[in-house]
């Protein structure tokens, strides 16, 4: 059996042709494909506006800036996430506050969000972990009660959805139905890729305008915003923005990939079903569950085992199966320790981390490869 990575992109000939066409065009960046990609993604997710950026971290950063996060502000996010979900708060001078997770899902726990609220809380960044949405109805209720901004971190969860508790209506992640903004990531291991890339979705035109400013140096050429004008060449800088632009080359790939996203997600669900069926019969293995009324887009497949370190090391040393851990609790990192964060903040997150292994999950994974992964994991757990 060849090497099986824990995740990889699925690039086909039509993707390559789309990128080649972009390379032959007169616009490699700041051209029409950026606008097309933004409009296509906004329509797909059910949002009014989309702002494409260079990566998911940039999306989080400008979302925090647009939300008004600044020195002294606290922002609550999950302890189990990639560091960027908290780093974006630090970039703005704010303080990340870590909420614990729900056992069984690794999703941010609304009950612990309530416990972490203070007079300084400005926003909540709920993380849709492994493809499954957090409890946005409850989190939205908390935000409304306390006049807080919500920025959904949906880096894992494009195309995911959840059902409203008192109706049969399904809400798409990215529609911003329960939030002010939603961020997406298009990294190579995500459900849809532009190599590197990200996006902020919103239904608020004022936020949209701020996001556009922050993406591109805070500069505008629109007479709508100018204090003065000296002609069509003239531009003004109104905010301390950044160069977070996504190129037309990358957007060409994103447009092509978006046409196949439903196919990609369907295959991920098939693989998850094979894993669920196999591991539900093994007492020594637990795994992240999909909650009733939630439709995961299956970015990751996480098993939970005792003796995680030994099993992980055996899989690395004795098989050709790529495995990973998602994630180290953010406040465990040395940088956060230097800021004064200590272990013990989020007991459920720490328990989860001690047991979690991410196993291969990507749409090109063949059935015989899935079966091989299952056999090897059964073997090491039994031993």
PLM regions: where:
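N-terminal "arm"/small-domain region of PLP-dependent enzymes with the aminotransferase-like
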Residues: 1-27, 32, 236-238, 360
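PLP-dependent aminotransferase class I/II
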Residues: 35-40, 47-50, 111, 123-127, ...
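Structural detector of well-ordered beta-strand residues that form the stable sheet scaffold
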Residues: 51, 76, 97, 150-151, ...
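PLP-dependent aminotransferase-like
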Residues: 65-165
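Glycine-/small-residue-rich active-site loops that bind phosphorylated ligands and cofactors
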Residues: 11, 29, 81, 104-105, ...
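Conserved active-site segment immediately N-terminal to the catalytic lysine
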Residues: 152-193, 209, 233-237
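Phosphate-binding glycine-rich loop
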Residues: 27-74, 88-92, 98-100, 165
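Short beta-strand-to-turn element immediately C-terminal to the catalytic PLP-Schiff-base lysine
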Residues: 184-185, 198-203, 255
